[in-house]
Structures are given as structure tokens and as C-alpha cells.
Amino acid sequence: MSLVETDWLDQNLNDVKIIDCSWHMPQTKRVGFEEYKKVHIPNAIFFDLDKNSKKNTSLPHMLVEKADWEEIVSKMGIKNDDKIIIYDNSDVISSCRCWFNFIYFGHNSEMVHVLNGGLKKWIKEKRKITCLLYTSPSPRDTR
């Protein structure tokens, strides 16, 4: 897994797809999407780990089928040749799970990275944040 530093992302905000994949254990009473709506890195797209996992299983967060994955990333406006930076604001390292999903489904491992330190480090360094929700462009071909 490749990490990128906050300095690098700050200089390349408009050249990459940024994904907030914050997920919290249920007992914490924290909800990743609710936190995303209040604060996130500019241009970040929220990836809902619960919503984007297989539904017809008793096990949590199982991978969806390839066709379902392609629909998910297409709706997010992501193509196979996009450089992707994934981060989270959680203690369970959900960004790594999201990274795994992209690699498992064939996205080039040199194009998918995790932000070192996540949102906590980004905010601690007083970098630009927003509450504006990302609006996905029309779905694209993800193949």
C-alpha cells in the first residue's frame, strides 16, 4: 500500500479523486457520513462502507460483485485511470479497507493511495476543509 503525505495532496487537490471512507464501530455512536457532511477535504467523495458492501450475507462488509462495484465507482465519477487518494477520520483504518476494494477489483495499485495521517493530521496542520458536499458528474465508464 502506498501512502501520500498531506503536503503532496494539498498541492494536487484538483488532480486526483479524493475519497473519505470514514467508518466507525457502532458502539462509538459516530456516523462517518454525518461527520463528512460537517467537515472534509475539499472535493472529497464519501464512500459508505456499509452501503457499498454485500447485503445478502450475515458477515459485515463483504465485497460486492464486480458488476456492482463498477456501478458504485461509476456513480462516484471514478474511472480506472483516475489517481485516487483515500482517507478516513476513524480509529479502525477504514481507508485501508477502501484501498483494498479498489485493488481487488483491478484498479492500478500505483494509482490508489492512502493519505498518511488521514483527516486528523490534515486538520491538525490547519489545511483547507469544507462542508460542501461533492456532486458527482454523470456516471462514467469504469472499465
Show which residues each predicted segment covers.
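Positively charged, proline/Ser/Thr-rich regional signature most characteristic
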Residues: 2-81
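Structural signal for conserved beta-strand scaffold positions within catalytic alpha/beta enzyme cores
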Residues: 20, 46-48, 86, 114, ...
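Single conserved hydrophobic/aromatic residue that forms the stacking wall/gate
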Residues: 134-143
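Long, charge-dense
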Residues: 118-122
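Catalytic cysteine-centered active loop of the rhodanese-like fold, especially the PTP/DSP P-loop
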Residues: 61-116
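Conserved active-site segments centered on acidic
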Residues: 125-129
